[in-house]
A protein has these predicted regions:
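N-terminal signal-anchor module of multipass membrane proteins
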Residues: 1-58, 400, 404
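Long, contiguous internal "core" modules enriched in hydrophobic/ aromatic residues
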Residues: 5, 9-18, 73, 111, ...
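Extramembrane terminal tails and long inter-domain/linker segments of multi-pass membrane proteins
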Residues: 1-12, 17, 112, 144-170, ...
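Membrane-interface interhelical loops and short amphipathic "cap" helices
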Residues: 23-47, 98-120, 191-213, 240, ...
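Hydrophobic alpha-helical transmembrane segments
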Residues: 50-57, 121-134, 217, 290-301, ...
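Transmembrane-helix bundle segments that line or gate the permeation/cavity pathway
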Residues: 27-34, 51-158, 176-185
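Central hydrophobic cores of alpha-helical transmembrane segments
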Residues: 318-328
Length: 415
């Protein structure tokens, strides 16, 4: 067991170092190493950022509810839920720095913040969220540190009995949960508003987007918690904790059902409107990116059916498989926020042609004349480069590094 933990730590460290090297290369060359342009200025970085924020929010929502509603069957997973939220929040913060592209931009957001920008508020909320999730992990680990004589900023409990430490841990975990729950909802609401406040993008400009983000956050965050809980608990505790696993499965399934309901409402209204904009949007969704959109819809549906089934949730493999495809679908969902919104120029005019009035997309500057060979375009097909994937290893590697280190040093699951 200790050997596998060390291997996990080494792999996570290697990912982080590779991502850091890629980031240094990006700082030297600029965002030109990506496939982003003036038209498609939010790429894989922003999609991954929204993904990590969602997983972080979902993990903390579950952790907070465990203590606020005193769910006994889920209490063994409280530390895992809080730690996954902390790790993903740190990864999301790193992804913001990566997307800013240069040291000057990073410094400007702290030295000269523009408070009318949702991104500034997202940075503020994420920073507070990192502190809250760390405190949640800290207080939940205190009893274990007291029992095993481990150090985790716990000098203040040396002269306290184990009973006093356990009482303190439970009290403060509940207090933090009371604050962290609205923060978890707030962090993803602000992230959703970054998209929803862009009036020129038909695909984003909807009041449904923030609650839909929350639903997917609960589904993806719950999926990561479920994977970690099953893997760290091992076979010997599976039957004992099956009731807790099934509760998480139902939470994930309900969240997916809510997401699919919101998606259906958006598609029905778009089809009903029948405007040029909505018809163009549906054409992009089911035509140009039909395969990706099918993955986004089919994978969570399969997971939802799996998690609602008592028979299938009796299998460790089925639950892990369902959780993995939920995480995959969530990342695809974040990517599909961008592709339909940025593929075509948002400026258009009605022009008179041979067949009557037609909608003409006004070409805009690409900013990539050397690479593309032409300065203006009305459509842009974005594809993340190898360099983007390499740089993205930094935030994702950081998430795994935190999880691996804490798993090696501290008892996340009491056997």
């Amino acid at each position: 067991m200790a050997r596998s933990k060390r291997i996990f730590l080494i792999v996570a460290l290697a990912m982080t170092c590779a991502g850091f090297a890629g980031w240094i290369y990006q700082l030297m060359r600029g965002l030109v190493i990506t496939d982003m342009s003036n038209m498609f200025n939010w790429g894989f970085y922003i999609a991954a950022f929204a993904f990590l924020v969602g997983v972080a929010a979902g993990g903390m929502i579950i952790s907070s509810c465990i203590y606020l509603f005193d769910v006994e069957k889920l209490k063994p997973f409280g530390k895992i839920a809080s730690l996954s939220a902390f790790a993903c929040a740190c990864g999301a913060g790193a992804m913001v720095l990566v997307d800013l592209g240069s040291i000057q931009n990073i410094l400007n957001i702290f030295i000269h913040p523009n408070f009318s920008s949702p991104l500034v508020w997202d940075v503020i909320v994420i920073s507070c969220y990192i502190v809250l999730t760390f405190l949640s992990v800290y207080f939940q680990l205190l009893p274990d540190c007291k029992k095993d004589g481990l150090w985790f900023f716990n000098g203040g409990i040396r002269n306290q009995s184990l009973e006093e430490v356990e009482k303190k841990s439970h009290t403060w975990s509940k207090r933090i949960g009371l604050v962290a729950l609205p923060f978890a909802i707030g962090i993803h609401t602000v992230t959703a508003l970054i998209f929803a406040t862009q009036n020129s993008h038909e695909w984003w400009h909807t009041a449904i987007l923030p609650p839909d983000f929350i639903a997917m956050a609960v589904a993806s965050g719950g999926s990561l918690v479920l994977i970690l809980a099953i893997v760290l608990s091992g076979r010997e505790l599976f039957n004992e904790r099956l009731g807790g696993y099934r509760i998480i499965c139902r939470i994930i399934a309900v969240a997916i059902a809510v997401h699919l309901f919101f998606t259906a409402m958006e598609l029905i209204l778009a089809a009903w409107a029948g405007s040029v904009e909505t018809q163009s949007l549906l054409g992009v969704l089911f035509g140009d990116y039909g395969v990706l959109y099918a993955i986004e819809l089919i994978l969570p549906t399969v997971a939802m059916v799996t998690f609602f089934s008592k028979k299938w949730t009796a299998s460790k493999g089925q639950m892990v498989f369902g959780s993995v495809i939920v995480l995959m679908a969530t990342l695809v969902h974040r990517l599909m926020l961008l592709y339909p919104a940025f593929k075509n120029a948002t400026v258009s005019f009605d022009v008179l042609g041979a067949n009557g009035m037609a909608d003409w997309l006004y070409p805009v500057s690409t900013g990539r004349v050397i690479e593309m060979g032409f300065p203006f375009a009305s459509t842009y097909a974005y594809m993340p480069t190898v360099a983007e994937y390499l740089v993205s290893l930094l935030p994702f590697g950081l998430v795994l590094l935190i999880l691996a280190f804490m798993n090696l040093k501290y008892p996340l699951v009491r056997r």
